[in-house]
Amino acid sequence: MQLITNFSSSSSELQFLVDKVKRESLSSSSSNTQNLFLSTSPYDTAWLALIPHPHHHHHHGRPMFEKCLQWILHNQTPQGFWAAAGDNISDTDDDVTLDCLLSTLACLVALKRWQLAPDMIHKGLEFVNRNTERLVMKQKPSDVPRWFTIMFPAMLELAGASSLRVDFSENLNRILVELSQNRDDILTREEVDEKKQYSPLLLFLEALPAQSYDNDVLKQIIDKNLSNDGSLLQSPSATARAYMITGNTRCLSYLHSLTNSCSNGGVPSFYPVDDDLHDLVMVNQLTRSGLTEHLIPEIDHLLLKVQKNYKYKKASPKSLYSIAAELYRDSLAFWLLRVNNHWVSPSIFCWFLDDDEIRDHIETNYEEFAAVLLNVYRATDLMFSGEVQLVEARSFATKNLEKILATGNIHKTNADISSSLHKMIEHELRVPWTARMDHVENRIWIEEIASSALWFGKSSYLRLSCFHKMSLQQLAVKNYTLRQLVYRDELAEVERWSKERGLCDMGFCREKTGYCYYAFAASTCLPWSSDVRLVLTKAAVVITVADDFFDVEGSMVDLEKLTDAVRRWDAEGLGSHSKTIFEALDDLVNEVRLKCFQQNGQDIKNNLQQLWYETFHSWLMEAKWGKGLTSKPSVDVYLGNAMTSIAAHTMVLTASCLLGPGFPVHQLWSQRRHQDITSLLMVLTRLLNDIQSYLKEEDEGKINYVWMYMIENNQASIDDSVRHVQTIINVKKQEFIQRVLSDQHCNLPKSFKQLHFSCLKVFNMFFNSSNIFDTDTDLLLDIHEAFVSPPQVPKFKPHIKPPHQLPATLQPPHQPQQIMVNKKKVEMVYKSYHHPFKVFTLQKKQSSGHGTMNPRASILAGPNIKLCFS
C-alpha cells in the first residue's frame, strides 16, 4: 500500500513538472524564447550597462539599458564575483574560472561608472585581488588562452582608469606585464578583421586599445562587418562598443532587440540564436534527459518544423567565424531527425568536408571546436550502409577528438575545455552508441555540467540556461527517480518468479536474473509496459539456465528428452532439472499467450511453442557437434544454427506479442522468417558473443565462428579472424540501424523495430570489449546507479539580492520616452557623455595623415595607458 501511495504521489508531482516545462519552454504562446535559451553573460551585460541614456544629462546621467545595471546589482555572488546565471556557485573560490575575472572587472567598472554600490565594489575587488594570481599563474603566459590574453589587460586598464584599485604581488605584476606584451604581439601580428582565427580580433572590439587603430579605418571595418541584424559578429559587448564608436543606428536597434528579449536584464554572449538551433537544442536536452515519453507531441511538432525548414533552406556562403554555430546546429539536426525516423541526408552537415579552408580552420582550432566535433561524431553513429560522407566525417572527428584527449592537462589548452566535456568525449569514443543503456545515459546527461554546453564562444562555452531552470532539472531528476521506483519493484517481482520456479537453485548454472532485468530495463527509455520488460527478463533467465544445462550439466539422453518434450510440449518423462526448465518455460509461454489474447484477441500458442522448440533444437545440435557425435559443420552451417541458438529473436518475438492492442501479431509471425531486421539481429548478436568468448569456448571444446573462420582459411591468424568478424559486425550493424531508423526498407511498427534495437544494445553492452555477462560483479555499480542511487546534480544557489536600488537620478521616468533611432538623437548620446574616468577622456592621437580620433572612440583611449597596479 505504501509503495502504491508513493508512486501515485510521485506520478502527480511528475505530471505537474511536465506541465510546467510545457508552459515555460515549449508552449508556442511563450514569449521571449531567447531569454530561455542561453545563459546570461555578466561581461556582456556590463558593457550594455555602460551606455548612457541620450536624454538624461544631469549629474552623471543614467544608463540607456537600466535593466542591465539592475541585473548587475542583483547578481553578485556571496564570494564577490559575477558568473553566468545558472552556474554552480559553491561556497569557495575553487570553481572560479578565468572568465569570472573578466566578468567581475566589467561589472565593477559599470557600478563605478554610475557611482553605485561601493560595498559591492569593495567585495568584488577583494575577489579579484584574492584570485587573480591563483588563476593566471596556473599556466605560463604563453599558455594562457588567446581570448584572455587579449581581454584581461584591457579590463585591467579600464579598471585602473576607473579608479578601481587592485593590489597584486610583484611576481604577478611581472607575469601581467608579459601577458600585456603577448597581447601587443597579437595585435601587431593579426589584422583586426582577419578571419583565420577561431575568434577574429573584431570580436574583441571592446578590448582593443583605441590608440592602436585609426578611427576612420576602424569605422569602415565595423560597417563592413555588421550583420543584417545590426550586430558585430553576434556579440553584444562588441556591438555595444561598435555603437559607441560609430553611432550606427543598426547597432542600436540590435541592442534594443537584445534587451527586449531578455526580460531579467541579463544578456547572453551570443545573440540572436537561430530558431532551428533553439528548437533542436531543446529537443536534444529533453531526449538525452530521458523525457521523450512525456513530450512526444511537442517534440514531433518541433522536429517537423525543423525538417521543413531544412527542406527549403538554400545553401549560402559560410564565414569562418560562423562555422562553429552552423556545424553544431546541422550535425545536431541530422542526429535528432534521423534518430526519430525522419528522412535526412548526411549532406546537411557534411558540407564542411568539401571545403579545404573550413577543414583546415577546424583542425587548426580543434580545441575550440571540441563540442562541435563531438556533435559531428555523434551524428555519424547513425550511419547507414554506403554513406561514404559519414565515414569520412567520423574519421575526421575521431582524429581531432583523440588529439583533444591526448593534450592531458586540459587547463593548458587554448580553449577552456572543462573536465566534464573531457569526460563526455572519452565516453563517446570508448563506448559504442549501440552498447549504451539509455537509462544510464540519461543519468550521465543529467549529472554532467557539460551537457548544457553548446559551442565555444568568445571566452567560454555558450550554455543552455533553460536546462538549469529549476523546473527542467527537477523534472529530469523526478522522472529518473520514479523510473527507479518502478524498476526496483519489477526486479523484485522477477526475482520472486525465478525463485518460485526453481531457476535460482539449480546449482550448475549462472544466476543472472539481476543482470538480465537491468539490461532490458535500462536499454531503452521508451514507454514499454511492465509486461514487456518482465517477459524479456523471464525469457532471458530461462534461456541462460537452459543453455547452461545443454553446455555443462545434461547428458545427451537428458538433452534429447528435453528437446523432444518441448517439441511435444509435454513434460512427461523429464527428470528434475529438465522438468524445472520445462515448467518455467511453460509458465512463461502461458503468461504471454493469455496476455496477448486479452490485448489482441489472438491465440499464439502454436507460434510460441514452435519458436522455443527451434531454439532448443539448435542447442541440441551444438551439443552434438561439441561432443563429436556428428561431423563438424562448415562456417555457413554453423552460423545458420548459431543465429538461432543465441536466442535473441526468441526473446524479442516472445515479448513483441505484448507491445499493445492492435499490434499485428499474426502478420509478423507469418513473416518472421523473412524479416531482415530479425535476421540481422540474430547474426549480430551471435557474432558479438563469439568475438568475446572464443578463448573460453575453445577451452570447453565448443564451436565458435572465430575459430572456424581461421580453420577454413589456412593463411589467417587468430587476429585476422577477429578482424574479419569485426568487419562483418560493422557492416551488418549499419544495415541493422538502417532498418531500425528508416521506413524505406523496413515497413514495420516502430515499437517492433525499437524492441529489436534494444535487444542489440543489450548484447553489445554484454559483449563490447569483454564478456561482462559471465562476470559476477562488473555490473553491480551500474545496477545500483540505475535502480537505487538518485542522480547527483549540482544544487544551484540563488545569488543574494542586495538591498541596492537605483538612485532617483537613475530611476526611469514615470512616462518612459521612446528612443527615436535617427542620426540626430544618436548624436545626443555622445554630446552628453561626460565620463568621469580617465579612460574615457578624449586623447589626441599624433596623426600621420589619418586625422584625429573620434570622441566616440575614446572609451579605451589614451596613447600610453599602462597596467594600473598599486
Swiss-Prot record:
Keywords assigned by UniProt, alphabetized: Lyase, Magnesium, Manganese, Metal-binding
Tissue expr: Highly expressed in cells of the transmitting tract of the stigma and style and in the epidermal cells of petals, as well as in stamens.
Bridged cysteine pairs (disulfide): none
Positions contributing to Mg(2+) 2 binding: 547, 551
Organism of provenance: Clarkia breweri
One Gene Ontology term of the molecular function aspect: S-linalool synthase activity
Stated role: Involved in the biosynthesis of the acyclic monoterpene S-linalool, a major component of the strong sweet scent of the C.breweri flowers.
Reactions catalysed: (2E)-geranyl diphosphate + H2O = (S)-linalool + diphosphate
Protein name per its UniProtKB record: S-linalool synthase
Entry's Gene Ontology BP terms: diterpenoid biosynthetic process
Motif segment (DDXXD motif): 547-551
EC class (word): lyase
Binding-site residues, Mg(2+) 3: 689, 693, 697
Pfam families, alphabetized: Terpene_synth (PF01397), Terpene_synth_C (PF03936)
Cofactor(s) listed in the protein's UniProt record: Mg(2+); Mn(2+)
Protein encoded by which gene: LIS
Family: Belongs to the terpene synthase family.
Binding site for Mg(2+) 1: 547, 551
Domain notes: The Asp-Asp-Xaa-Xaa-Asp/Glu (DDXXD/E) motif is important for the catalytic activity, presumably through binding to Mg(2+).
Enzyme Commission number(s): 4.2.3.25
Cofactor: binding details: Binds 3 Mg(2+) or Mn(2+) ions per subunit.
